[in-house]
Regions:
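A Rossmann-like FAD-binding core segment of flavoenzymes
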Residues: 230-272, 277, 332-431, 470-477
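FAD-site-proximal beta/loop scaffold in flavoenzymes
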Residues: 282, 287, 292-309, 398, ...
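Rossmann-like nucleotide/phosphate-binding core characteristic of flavoprotein oxidoreductases
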Residues: 7, 104, 108-110, 114, ...
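Glycine-rich dinucleotide-binding loop and its adjacent helix/turn
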Residues: 160, 166-172, 281-334, 428-431
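Structural micro-motif
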Residues: 16-35, 123-137
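Non-catalytic, surface beta->alpha helical segment in thiol-disulfide oxidoreductase systems
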Residues: 27-60, 135-163
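Beta1-alpha1 glycine-rich phosphate/pyrophosphate-binding loop at the start
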Residues: 79-87, 91-93, 97-99, 104, ...
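Thiol-based oxidoreductase modules, predominantly thioredoxin-like and allied folds used
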Residues: 10-19, 107-121
Length: 477
C-alpha cells in the first residue's frame, strides 16, 4: 500500500528497515516528524495518511486559523500521544487528523495511530471499550468523537501552556454569531449579505448536524449526510467576508452597555453590539453514579462507532425516542441481546421504528424504568441498576455495555444568568428571536423555538439576523 502511495509522486519514497511489523513513520527531508502508524491505515483512516503527507508538504487544508495554531505551539512538551482506532469508525479520522496536525505544528509532540483490531492484546490490557481512545503519555484523556478544539483544550489542561505565547486581544465586529450549525451559519450569511462585519465563533462548523448519519427531510435535498451538510455550510459561509473562528469555547460574557464582550479561556475577546446565540444542544447525560467513571469503558453514546466492541454481548440502550430505538435496531444486528430502558410509560419513537424493534427477537423493551446507577467492577461496566416507576421494585441487569440516548440539552450555560431561560435551559425568545436583553438574539436548538429540526434552525438563524439588522437600523442597538 505504501509503495502505491509513493508511486503518486516523485517526492515520496518508501524505505523498509528492521522493526515492528505493520508499523511505519513519516519523515520529512530525512527527519522524523513524530507521526507514526501501527497498522494499515486503510478504510476510513486512509485519508489520515494522505492528509498527514499533504500537511507536511504545506498543502493540507485541516489546519485551524493562526490564533489556534499559536495555542498548539504554546503547549508545554514533550507530549507523546497514542490513538487506538477502528478502521470502520467514522469518528476516528477526525481525531487522528487533528492530532497529526498538532504534531506537525509542535516540534515536541508525537502521535501514533494504532489499529485496535490488530493490536487486540493492547486493547484488552488497557480495557478499551470505545474508540477513538487517546492516551497522553500512557494516560487516557479522551474517548469518542472529538474535534481539534476539544482535543487541544484537554492537552492544555493536562500539560499546561507557555503564557508568553498565548494571545490576549479584543476583536471588534458588527455581529458575532456563536455556533456554526444550521442556525449559526444561516445567521452569519444573512448578516454578511447586509454588509456587516461578521464573525462566527464556534467549537466546530456543523455543530450537532455532524453527528447525523443520514438526512432526508431537508427540503429540496432528497438525501445527504451530516458531514456533507456541515462542509456545505462552511463552503457557503466562505463565499462571504465572514471571519470563521472555529475551535473556540466562550467562557465569559459581559452584556451590559451597547457593546457585548465574549471571552474564551485562552484570552481572546470578541466585541460587538449584536450577538446571535446559536450554540445548539448536546447529548444529555444520565447523571447517575458510575456514568462518568465508565465512559469509554462500557458507557457509550455512539452505536455506529462503539457498537462493534460489543459484538455478541448484551447491551442496554437508555432512551425510547427515535435515536434510542434506532440505536437498538442497529445494535441488534451485532449484539446477542439489546435491552431498551425508557423512563416514561411509553416509547416516544415513531411507530415504524417501534414496530421494527419489537419484531427483533433479541430486543426487549421496558418502559417506566428509571436508571439509578451504572455498575462496574473497577475496570468496565458489568450492569445497570434500574427501578420500576410503577411498583418501586429495583433490580440489577447484568450486561456489558450501556448506550445513552436520552436526547439533547441546550448549550446555554454561560448565558443562563444573563438572559431569560426556561427550566430545560433553553433561551426564551419572542417571535423575532429577540431575548429579554437588547442586542442579544437566539436561534435554533438553544432557543425555545418548537421542533428541533435542521430546516427550522436555518429559518430561525435568518430571522435572528434580520431582527438584529432591523434593530441596528432603528437605533435600538
Amino acid at each position: 500500500m505504501l509503495h502505491d502511495v509513493a508511486s503518486c509522486s516523485s517526492h515520496i519514497s518508501v524505505q523498509v528497515g528492521d522493526g515492528d511489523g505493520l508499523c511505519f513513520h513519516i519523515l520529512r527531508d530525512g527527519e522524523m516528524t513524530g507521526i507514526s502508524f501501527r497498522g494499515i491505515p486503510n478504510g476510513h483512516e486512509f485519508t489520515s495518511l494522505l492528509l498527514a503527507i499533504l500537511n507536511l508538504d504545506g498543502k493540507g487544508k485541516n489546519f485551524p486559523d493562526e490564533s489556534v495554531c499559536r495555542r498548539v505551539r504554546a503547549l508545554k512538551g514533550p507530549v507523546h500521544l497514542t490513538t487506538y482506532v477502528s478502521l470502520t469508525c467514522t469518528n476516528c479520522p477526525d481525531v487522528v487528523q487533528a492530532l497529526n496536525a498538532m504534531t506537525t505544528l509542535h516540534p515536541q509532540l508525537s502521535h501514533v495511530m494504532v489499529d485496535g483490531a490488530i493490536h487486540q492484546d493492547e486493547v484488552n490490557a488497557l480495557k478499551i471499550q470505545g474508540v477513538p481512545a487517546v492516551f497522553a503519555d500512557g494516560k487516557l484523556i479522551h474517548v469518542g468523537r472529538g474535534d481539534f478544539g476539544q482535543l487541544l483544550s484537554k492537552l492544555e489542561a493536562e500539560y499546561g501552556v507557555d503564557e508568553s505565547m498565548t494571545e490576549q486581544s479584543i476583536k471588534d465586529y458588527d455581529v458575532v454569531v456563536l455556533g456554526g450549525g444550521p442556525a449559526g451559519s444561516s445567521a452569519a450569511i444573512y448578516s454578511a449579505r447586509k454588509g456587516l462585519k461578521v464573525a462566527v465563533v464556534a467549537e466546530r462548523i456543523g455543530g450537532q448536524v455532524k453527528e447525523t448519519v443520514g438526512i432526508e427531510n431537508l427540503i429540496s435535498v432528497p438525501e445527504t449526510t451530516g458531514a456533507h451538510l456541515a462542509e456545505n455550510l462552511r463552503l457557503h459561509m466562505q463565499q462571504y467576508p465572514i471571519s470563521i473562528l472555529e475551535h473556540r469555547h466562550i467562557v465569559k460574557v459581559e452584556l451590559d452597555g451597547k457593546y457585548k464582550l465574549l471571552s474564551t479561556a485562552t484570552g481572546e475577546t470578541f466585541r460587538a453590539p449584536a450577538v446571535i446565540v446559536a450554540t445548539g444542544a448536546s447529548w444529555r447525560r444520565l447523571n447517575v453514579p458510575g456514568e462518568n467513571d465508565y465512559i469509554g469503558r462500557g458507557v457509550a453514546f455512539c452505536p455506529h462507532c462503539d457498537g462493534p466492541f460489543y459484538k455478541g454481548k448484551h447491551v442496554a440502550v437508555v432512551g425510547g425516542g427515535n435515536s434510542g430505538i434506532e440505536a437498538a435496531i442497529d445494535l441488534a444486528g451485532i449484539c446477542s441481546k439489546v435491552t431498551v430502558l425508557e423512563f416514561l410509560d411509553g416509547l416516544k419513537a415513531d411507530r415504524v421504528l417501534q414496530d421494527k424493534a419489537r419484531s427483533l427477537s433479541n430486543v426487549e423493551i421496558f418502559v417506566s424504568s428509571q436508571t439509578l446507577e451504572v455498575v462496574g467492577n473497577g475496570d468496565k461496566v458489568v450492569g445497570i441498576r434500574v427501578k420500576d416507576r410503577n411498583t418501586g421494585e429495583e433490580r440489577l441487569i447484568s450486561l456489558d455495555g450501556i448506550f445513552v440516548q436520552i436526547g439533547l440539552a441546550a448549550n446555554s450555560a454561560v448565558f443562563r444568568d444573563m438572559v431569560e431561560t426556561n427550566r430545560p435551559g433553553e433561551i426564551v425568545i419572542d417571535t423575532h428571536c429577540r431575548t429579554n436583553v437588547a442586542g442579544i438574539y437566539a436561534a435554533g436548538d438553544v432557543s425555545t423555538v418548537p421542533y428541533k429540526q435542521i430546516i427550522i434552525s436555518m429559518g430561525e438563524g435568518a430571522k435572528a439576523a434580520l431582527s438584529a439588522f432591523e434593530d441596528r437600523v432603528r437605533g435600538v442597538i
